[in-house]
Amino acid sequence: MVKLAITLGDPSGINSEILLKALNKLPKRNISYVIYGSKKALEKAKKLTGVDLNIKEIKSINDVVKSGIYLINLYDLDVEFGSSSKETGKASVVYLENAVKDVLEKKADALITLPISKQWIMESGFPYAGHTDYLAEVSGAKEYAMVLMCKKLKVALITTHIPLKDVPSQITKEKIISKVRLINREFKEKFGISKPKIAILGLNPHASDNGNIGNEEQNIILPAVKTLREDGIEITDPLSPDTAFNRYKDFDIYVAMYHDQGLIPLKLLCFRKAVNITLGLPFIRTSPDHGTGYDIAGKNIADPSSTIEAVELAILLKRVRK
């Protein structure tokens, strides 16, 4: 039996709605879904969506003995959908901390995190700007990589949520080597790809056009590529970002230098179907690739597709790992 820990994220957003809709469509055989979240939020979403699932409330993940849907009821706020606050931010943190404890103790096979608000978790006193940095620190991960993916395309990021003006200074030969080595290793282990084909993007227009438009390609990216090839890793020279994705069928993963460079094409190809996975953690962690959806919360129009994909990916990765 595959046992999945699912954090509800911010209970005032669309999370309860999309989770019920997703669970209604996901497979039930030999899988237990353990939700860390608010009973009141889920009950409210049940009335909103008309999705009436058999969810058993338990005190601990240790109480799970067979397949099914379970709830560990924590920080049970009487929320108004679309109305977020420090309290809903705090609730998000409580769900996350409890789930991560169980995952680190190997009581669950994977972690699926539903969206949180960076603003409200930080205003509630949480010292991290999001899930990933927290998960890396509490798990002791020395190196990790953010990968967004769908069935057509996978993209890893060298830099993530930083201002564009700070990107060049954050790109180093050492960082590229470290992250690509991690990606190569994790794609072998997690996805069963014996020799991943990796495409790396340049930073500048036309990958600098031989140093005529910037020099990061010649001074940083190409030397990193040379070292990686000496390791036996199959990786391209830095590709011109504006045309690189035309060849997406030729590669297992792209490595982008910054957030929008990699995610604009991904979301164009895979809108509502993309999934976030964190490589380098000692456990499987996936999440849907969207936010809390405060603006549409409570309207019963939220699309659960990305959550379904996130859960299905976690199940697949668990089975590949066996």
UniProtKB/Swiss-Prot annotation:
UniProt cofactor note: Binds 1 divalent metal cation per subunit.
Sorted UniProt keywords: Cytoplasm, Metal-binding, NAD, NADP, Oxidoreductase, Pyridoxine biosynthesis
Residues that coordinate or bind a divalent metal cation: H161, H206, H259
Keyword GTP-binding: no
Enzyme type, top EC level: oxidoreductase
Gene Ontology MF annotations: 4-hydroxythreonine-4-phosphate dehydrogenase activity; metal ion binding; NAD binding
Reactions that this protein is recorded to catalyse: 4-(phosphooxy)-L-threonine + NAD(+) = 3-amino-2-oxopropyl phosphate + CO2 + NADH
Cofactor(s) it depends on: a divalent metal cation
Pathways per UniProt: Cofactor biosynthesis; pyridoxine 5'-phosphate biosynthesis; pyridoxine 5'-phosphate from D-erythrose 4-phosphate: step 4/5
InterPro entries: PdxA_fam
GO BP: pyridoxine biosynthetic process
Localization annotation: Cytoplasm
GO cellular component: cytoplasm
Residues reported to bind substrate: H131, T132, K267, N276, R285
Signal sequence coordinates: none
EC number(s) recorded for this UniProt protein: 1.1.1.262
Note: The active site is located at the dimer interface.
Subunit details: Homodimer.
Family: Belongs to the PdxA family.
Job description of the protein: Catalyzes the NAD(P)-dependent oxidation of 4-(phosphooxy)-L-threonine (HTP) into 2-amino-3-oxo-4-(phosphooxy)butyric acid which spontaneously decarboxylates to form 3-amino-2-oxopropyl phosphate (AHAP).
Protein name (Swiss-Prot/TrEMBL): 4-hydroxythreonine-4-phosphate dehydrogenase
Lineage of origin: Bacteria, Pseudomonadati, Aquificota, Aquificia, Aquificales
Chain's gene name: pdxA
